[in-house]
Amino acid sequence: MQRLPGVGPKTAQRLALHILKRPESEVEALAQALVEAKKQIGLCSVCFHLSSEPVCEICRNPNRENNTICVVADSRDVIALEKTREFKGKYHVLGGVISPMDGIGPEQLTITPLLRRVSQQQPKEVILAISPSVEGETTTLYVGQLLKPFTKVTRIAFGLPVGGDLEYADEITLARALEGRRELD
């Protein structure tokens, strides 16, 4: 259980004990549901988001804007952005970030299909929405440089969370908040 992301030793123990207390039929149903999900859910052939179809629902949706592509590291990022209901374009999931320490270079990500897609579709804008970790920044800069010859490249703004206090923010977050400032409407 500890191999699951975000599951530490205590949570793993709680989950294991809970499963052991459940009737065997429930445990088998859970195991079967996991196996079925693994079999039925793959990656969209266009954007590499999770999908039970060859092309995901977002890419198939005729109401989505084709002239804007939002590049994210992971399908969890698509889900988070979709919850805002603000982005009306399409996505491209890289499948991670460049992380030499973990053996992940550009070749292990879906950067080549992204370049091909941008070259063919010629969107007006590509938005890079990658977390501002060291690896995320590296990925953003690398992908941004590759895309600049083809289209306008922007990145999402970073700054203070809603309800956050200035005194608790680190210097980098405050600096980015100042850089990303905009005029009041």
From Swiss-Prot:
Q: Which GO terms describe its molecular function?
A: DNA binding; zinc ion binding
Question: Zn finger regions (C4-type) covering which residues?
Answer: 44-59
Q: Which residues form the signal peptide?
A: none
The record's listing under InterPro entries reads: DNA_Rcmb_RecR, Rcmb_RecR, Rcmb_RecR_Znf, TOPRIM_dom, TOPRIM_RecR
Q: Which SUPFAM superfamilies match?
A: Recombination protein RecR
A Gene Ontology biological process annotation?
DNA recombination
- Outline the extent of the Toprim domain: 67-161
Keywords in alphabetical order: DNA damage, DNA recombination, DNA repair, Metal-binding, Zinc, Zinc-finger
Q: Which PANTHER family match?
A: RECOMBINATION PROTEIN RECR
What the entry lists under HAMAP family is as follows: RecR
Family the entry assigns? Belongs to the RecR family.
What is the annotated role of this protein in its UniProt record?
May play a role in DNA repair. It seems to be involved in an RecBC-independent recombinational process of DNA repair. It may act with RecF and RecO.
Q: What is this protein called?
A: Recombination protein RecR
Protein source organism? Trichormus variabilis (strain ATCC 29413 / PCC 7937)
